[in-house]
């Protein structure tokens, strides 16, 4: 029996353009991994914002917390995610932005 029961379609843009831009041009493969992880979570939640701390993202992707923090900064700067937090110690929510789908 397969371990995973749900497949998630990934936009062509994410595979054909975004990977090349983030991994090749920006030299931030960690940012691409974090984006793919958030993309998957958001798709499973019908594109609602995803609550995830640095620790959760680090443990889920196998990256260090500092690598995740750098990745999130890049993704926010490139407007690929939006992050909100009620206060400084609250778990932030991340909204995956897909500007190419407009």
Can you annotate each of these PLM segments?
Residues 1-59, 89:
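Short recognition helix of helix-turn-helix/winged-helix DNA-binding domains
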Residues 24, 41-100:
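Winged helix-turn-helix DNA-binding recognition segment
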């Amino acid at each position: 029996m397969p371990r995973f029961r749900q497949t998630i379609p990934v936009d062509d843009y994410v595979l054909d353009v975004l990977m090349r831009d983030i991994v090749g041009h920006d030299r931030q493969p960690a940012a691409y991994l974090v984006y793919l992880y958030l993309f998957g979570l958001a798709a499973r939640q019908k594109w609602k914002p995803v609550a995830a701390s640095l620790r959760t993202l680090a443990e889920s992707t196998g990256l260090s917390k500092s690598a995740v923090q750098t990745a999130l900064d890049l993704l926010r700067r490139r407007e690929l995610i939006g992050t909100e937090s009620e206060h400084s110690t609250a778990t932030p929510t991340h909204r995956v932005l897909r500007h190419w789908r407009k």
